[in-house]
Amino acid sequence: MDTSSINAQSIFDDNAAALKLSWLTGHEGWERGFSAETVATATSSADLVGHLNLIHPNRIQVLGEAETNYYQRQSDEDRSRHMAELIALEPPFLVVAGGVAAPPELVLRCTRSSTPLFTTPMSPAAVIDSLRLYMSRILAPRATLHGVFLDILGMGVLLTGDSGLGKSELGLELISRGHGLVADDAVDFVRLGPDFVEGRCPPLLQNLLEVRGLGLLDIKTIFGETAVRRKMKLKLIVQLVRRPDGEFQRLPLESQTVDVLGLPISKVTIQVAAGRNLAVLVEAAVRNTILQLRGIDTLRDFMDRQRLAMQDPDSQFPGKLI
């Protein structure tokens, strides 16, 4: 991932209001950030933000009352040495939290070395938690996929398929049936956790759906506020096909999945043909997926019934025809 756009200035701009940050000194170092190597070797955002620790040179260092009290108890020689070590590590920036006053020597050294120094009245724990969450989102793996992303029965569903199959028309019909649009054509996905992928709409395409023959439709204006969603977790991919290929099975014994950002996502394949009610089929696929997530597998139940019937036909069919 390109980390050049992640610097002290961008982090300050994105978090100043929420964290009540003030930029005390070191404005010349606004371009300071994380190297690609630092980001690549970090196991999580916890490696990038934390309390004052000289062992982690590239971490955003947060100083609170405990750290400043410890500093005050040191001799002048130790104070100078610790401050010199801290600045020499070239952290992206420093934060003095908890409403405590920044030590004068720290302010002086940050000014001389162009090290950004922020202050905030918020507690160090709150600052660290917020910045870790922010860094997790900024540095999370992401990808853009083609399709129509919808909220169907509370589940994030991505409609995919070749151009001209009617994905947008199907999306429009599903919206008219009370479901919500997240994004059309291009969907930005980001993996924010170990077990979920979140999808959003690019700002340029917000609330818009393109339908052939009608052009661009503003779904929010036409159907109202409840017809659009800001984001959804991706749980199901519905692939539309003109005709089934050689691998298509009417009763697949194993669930199909698609790898999205390293996470397997359930997938169903629906053939597009004249007379088929695709909206009903998609809704049924979503309902079936919800049951599967709850541990209810209809196909497995049927196979169990079949096995029992083969073992003891009389118990399953007491009224056997003669």
From Swiss-Prot:
Top-level EC class as recorded in UniProt: transferase
Matching SUPFAM superfamilies: HprK N-terminal domain-like, PEP carboxykinase-like
Assigned keywords, A-Z: ATP-binding, Kinase, Magnesium, Metal-binding, Multifunctional enzyme, Nucleotide-binding, Serine/threonine-protein kinase, Transferase
Domain of life where this protein originates: Bacteria
One of the GO BP terms on file: regulation of carbohydrate metabolic process
Bilayer-crossing regions: none
InterPro entries: HPr(Ser)_kin/Pase, Hpr_kin/Pase_C, Hpr_kin/Pase_Hpr_N, P-loop_NTPase, Ser_kin/Pase_Hpr-like_N_sf
EC identifiers of the protein: 2.7.11.-, 2.7.4.-
UniProt cofactor(s): Mg(2+)
A GO term, aspect molecular function: phosphorelay sensor kinase activity
Region annotated Important for the catalytic mechanism of dephosphorylation, chain positions: 271-276
Enzymatic reactions: [HPr protein]-L-serine + ATP = [HPr protein]-O-phospho-L-serine + ADP + H(+); [HPr protein]-O-phospho-L-serine + phosphate + H(+) = [HPr protein]-L-serine + diphosphate
Ligand binding (Mg(2+)): S168, E210
Region (Important for the catalytic mechanism of both phosphorylation and dephosphorylation): 209-218
Active site: H146, K167, D185 (proton acceptor), R250
Residues annotated for ATP binding in this entry: G161, D162, S163, G164, L165, G166, K167, S168
Subunit structure: Homohexamer.
Note: Both phosphorylation and phosphorolysis are carried out by the same active site and suggest a common mechanism for both reactions.
Domain description: The Walker A ATP-binding motif also binds Pi and PPi.
Family: Belongs to the HPrK/P family.
Role summary: Catalyzes the ATP- as well as the pyrophosphate-dependent phosphorylation of a specific serine residue in HPr, a phosphocarrier protein of the phosphoenolpyruvate-dependent sugar phosphotransferase system (PTS). HprK/P also catalyzes the pyrophosphate-producing, inorganic phosphate-dependent dephosphorylation (phosphorolysis) of seryl-phosphorylated HPr (P-Ser-HPr).
Protein name: HPr kinase/phosphorylase
Source species: Paraburkholderia phymatum (strain DSM 17167 / CIP 108236 / LMG 21445 / STM815) (Burkholderia phymatum)
Record gene name: hprK
